[in-house]
Amino acid sequence: MKFDIAAIVPLMAVAISATPLEVRQSNQVTVALSNDQSGSYAGVTFQADNTDKSVFTLFSGTSVGAGGTVKATAAQLTNFTPSINCVIRNNGATIGTLTAQQTYLDLDGSSHAAIPINLNNAEIHCRV
């Protein structure tokens, strides 16, 4: 076999100088809602695309949305990027923020009681 060095050298130069592909950061986030009174729990994965998402639309087909009402006592990030920031609002009022440093949120604001909150009008806004 005869190798043509003139043909191989350019290919080697391209292969050596090629920069590795960057690992793309996923914009997917998984948020779970739990209801400590009923024992229901559901996690939903969606795009953290800097838009408002309806909590009712995300969770209505899950155990926390049984009976047509999404009720939960807590929210938790279960799969996320290090730069995630999710704000939960209900009826226009901010309930709280979930981040990589604060992955759990008591929705009723009471550490002494588990009071399910109706989240049918809630929105979650996540960005990376």
Which residues does each predicted region cover?
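Fungal secretory targeting signals
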Residues: 1-25, 128
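Mature, structured extracellular domains of secreted fungal proteins
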Residues: 19-128
